[in-house]
Design a protein with these regions (language model features):
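Short, hydrophobic-biased segments on the C-terminal half of alpha helices
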Residues: 47-48
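C-terminal regulatory/oligomerization modules of transcriptional regulators
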Residues: 1-2, 9, 21-35, 40, ...
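Short, Lys/Arg-rich nucleic-acid/phosphate-binding segment
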Residues: 60-66
Length: 110
């Protein structure tokens, strides 16, 4: 899946919380659902959608499933956003250099 699917998945506030929690490592559904204002089945549904979009992957640990972030999909989003940063930083660099050069021309020589 592309960065669009990942961004769509991350637009949901509950899924954003799940991603934040998974930053610390793999977790079972029960731990992920703890303290959320949605039911455990709702969290399971969110995780299925996230898995389908490639945001998380599941590994079996005995009788339970552990969910963990799939950094590949998040890396696609980072690469997409980097294009905007690259353009913005180039503009900032150009503006700073122009301002510096204009300042040098205005200063009286000693």
């Amino acid at each position: 899946m592309g960065y669009q699917a990942t961004l769509a998945i991350l637009a949901d506030p509950t899924r954003q919380v799940l991603v934040e929690r998974l930053r610390s490592g793999p977790m079972p559904v029960g731990k992920l659902a703890s303290g959320l204002p949605v039911s455990r089945p709702a969290v399971s549904k969110h995780l299925r959608l996230m898995k389908g979009a490639g945001v998380v992957r599941v590994t079996e640990d005995g009788t339970r499933n552990l969910y963990e972030l799939d950094l590949g999909s998040l890396d696609e989003v980072r690469r997409y956003l980097d294009r905007f940063w690259d353009t913005s930083l180039k503009r900032l660099k150009t503006a700073a250099e122009r301002s510096y050069e204009e300042g040098k021309r205005r200063r009286p020589r000693r």
